[in-house]
UniProtKB/Swiss-Prot annotation:
The protein's assembly and partners: Part of the ribosomal stalk of the 50S ribosomal subunit. Interacts with L10 and the large rRNA to form the base of the stalk. L10 forms an elongated spine to which L12 dimers bind in a sequential fashion forming a multimeric L10(L12)X complex.
InterPro entries linked: Ribosomal_uL11 (IPR000911), Ribosomal_uL11_bac-typ (IPR006519), Ribosomal_uL11_C (IPR020783), Ribosomal_uL11_C_sf (IPR036769), Ribosomal_uL11_CS (IPR020785), Ribosomal_uL11_N (IPR020784), Ribosomal_uL11_N_sf (IPR036796)
Keyword check for Membrane: no
GO biological process: translation
Protein name listed in UniProt: Large ribosomal subunit protein uL11
Entry annotated with the keyword RNA-binding: yes
Length: 142
């Protein structure tokens, strides 16, 4: 049997354990002709351990209207905000600092994000996360 033909890839950010047919999930999957409730059930089951976090998900749609999906780790900015208890980052990150983060906290976040980052080792991953912190107005402590 030949491999199924990929028709489309859909990228969404959905809150873990709370996928439902309402926007943004419903319209995006409906346009591709997918069974929305089937995706919601599978996604909620697979992501129930990470409730409360927004997870990026890449849905691959095939020509026979079947699908597969991959959940990725939460965005770095979301993990940084959660680690230091922020609501939002700074509107002017270079002049107005909104918090501080330690190297240990950066390493925890980097370990979580490691599989999705373009980094060879933990130090490179920490530097990537530190850059995200600086662009949010968070001071990185040595």
């Amino acid at each position: 049997m030949a491999a199924k033909k990929v028709v489309k890839q859909i990228k969404l950010q959905v809150e873990a354990g709370k996928a439902n047919p309402a926007p943004p999930v419903g319209p995006a999957l409906g346009q591709a002709g997918l069974n929305i409730m089937e995706f919601c059930k599978q996604f909620n089951e697979r992501s129930k351990a990470q409730i409360g976090l927004k997870l990026p998900v890449v849905i691959t749609v095939f020509s026979d209207r079947s699908f597969t999906f991959i959940t990725k780790s939460p965005p770095a900015a979301l993990l940084v905000k959660k680690a230091i208890g922020l609501e939002t980052g700074s509107p002017t990150p270079h002049t107005h600092k909104v918090g501080k983060i330690t190297r240990k906290q950066l390493e925890e976040i980097a370990k979580t994000k490691m599989e999705d980052l373009n980094a060879n080792d933990i130090d490179a991953a920490v530097n990537i996360i530190a850059g995200t912190c600086r662009s949010m107005g968070v001071t990185v402590e040595a």
